[in-house]
């Protein structure tokens, strides 16, 4: 069997010699190719014209399974990695292949495993967890049913129902992805975040990233002040500092966190702006290219980066560029 690794993961496993600014602390693996679904933003979508080795801005070269497993077991890789994450493309056999890969990986390492897949039933979620997977992620991507319908196949309501039922049946083991910048308001996203954490669901927050060959290739990324406010709201909610009910909004834009921004900066520093999701997940340059201001920082921020991030949080009312 062959498997795709993110290019940074391949570096950690000794499968390439590229230079990177930040090593991934999770081994990111992709199973399957060319999804049966047609998400407007995804390089792997059914009708996408993007390169087959892309997921977001990251390239995922393919390797022989034996080479990958040797690299994973190497002490150098084990010293860097904190987690293994399978990104499962929804073709006809990828979920079944993932079960086999989970078994193979567990024979080489004790690192926690998460699987971002599209299980259709509670039984499929249970099967993954019984194999020893720590987290199963069912990606909503969109904060509302309306935004979902504009950008994805299927039903937000049905997917949310399965995610909620799974979180109730398997507490502490469910996660989801949410993408900022698909057209939702800040209030939409914040209320969705609160709902997820009320149900015990871990959230990985992404900035929309236009990929050439996808239906949304011409749409701009969210401006930084918009994304920074959502990151702070996410941090406040997940740490229990305040609830979304305590926030204030004007025309859908977040204007008050229920705690002063000065106090939040003093208490939280750069934490809100680090990559979110499962413990040990840092996703270097998933939404950016090196040299740009980072939406999600893969490592601790410098003093200057912390100040810049909070300055964006304080920025006056704004609009998406180009709107």
Question: Model-derived features: where do they sit?
Answer:
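General structural feature for long, well-ordered alpha-helical segments within catalytic domains
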Residues: 64, 97, 101, 124, ...
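Alpha-helix N-cap and loop-to-helix initiation/capping positions
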Residues: 60-63, 151-158, 184, 188, ...
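Conserved Radical SAM active-site core
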Residues: 11-16, 29-36, 40-149, 155-169, ...
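Conserved strand-turn element in the central/C-terminal portion of the radical SAM core barrel
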Residues: 163-187, 206-213, 219
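Auxiliary Fe-S-binding modules of radical SAM enzymes
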Residues: 1-27, 51, 109, 191-323
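Hydrophobic/aromatic residues located in beta-strands of well-ordered beta-sheets
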Residues: 113, 136, 174-176, 203
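Catalytic cores of alpha/beta
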Residues: 121-131, 180-198
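Conserved short-loop catalytic and cofactor-binding motifs
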Residues: 56, 86-89, 177-180, 218-221
């Amino acid at each position: 069997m062959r498997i795709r690794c993110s290019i940074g993961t391949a570096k950690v496993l000794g499968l390439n010699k590229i230079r990177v600014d930040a090593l991934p602390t999770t081994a990111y693996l992709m199973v399957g190719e060319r999804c049966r679904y047609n998400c407007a933003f995804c390089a792997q979508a059914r009708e996408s014209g993007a390169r087959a080795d892309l997921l977001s801005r990251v390239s995922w070269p393919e390797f022989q399974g034996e080479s990958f497993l040797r690299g994973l077991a190497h002490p150098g890789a084990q010293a860097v990695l904190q987690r293994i994450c399978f990104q499962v493309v929804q073709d006809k056999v990828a979920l079944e292949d993932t079960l086999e890969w989970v078994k193979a990986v567990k024979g080489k390492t004790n690192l926690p495993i998460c699987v971002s897949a599209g299980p259709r039933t509670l039984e499929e979620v249970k099967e993954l967890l019984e194999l020893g997977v720590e987290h199963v992620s069912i990606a909503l991507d969109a904060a509302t049913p309306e935004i979902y319908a504009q950008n994805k196949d299927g039903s937000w309501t049905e997917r949310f129902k399965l995610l909620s039922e799974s979180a109730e049946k398997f507490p502490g083991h469910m996660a989801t992805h949410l993408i900022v910048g698909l057209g939702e308001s800040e209030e939409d996203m914040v209320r969705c975040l609160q709902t997820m954490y009320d149900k015990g669901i871990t959230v990985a927050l992404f900035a929309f990233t236009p990929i050439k060959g996808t239906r949304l290739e011409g749409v701009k990324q969210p401006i930084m002040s918009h994304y920074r406010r959502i990151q702070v709201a996410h941090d406040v909610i997940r740490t229990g500092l305040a609830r979304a009910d305590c926030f204030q909004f004007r025309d859908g834009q977040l204007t008050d966190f229920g705690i002063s921004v000065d106090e939040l900066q003093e208490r939280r520093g750069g934490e809100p702006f680090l990559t979110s999701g499962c413990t040990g997940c840092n996703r270097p340059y998933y939404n950016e290219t090196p040299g740009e201001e980072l939406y999600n920082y893969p490592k601790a921020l410098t003093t200057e980066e912390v100040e810049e991030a909070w300055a964006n949080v304080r920025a006056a009312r704004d609009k998406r560029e180009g709107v």
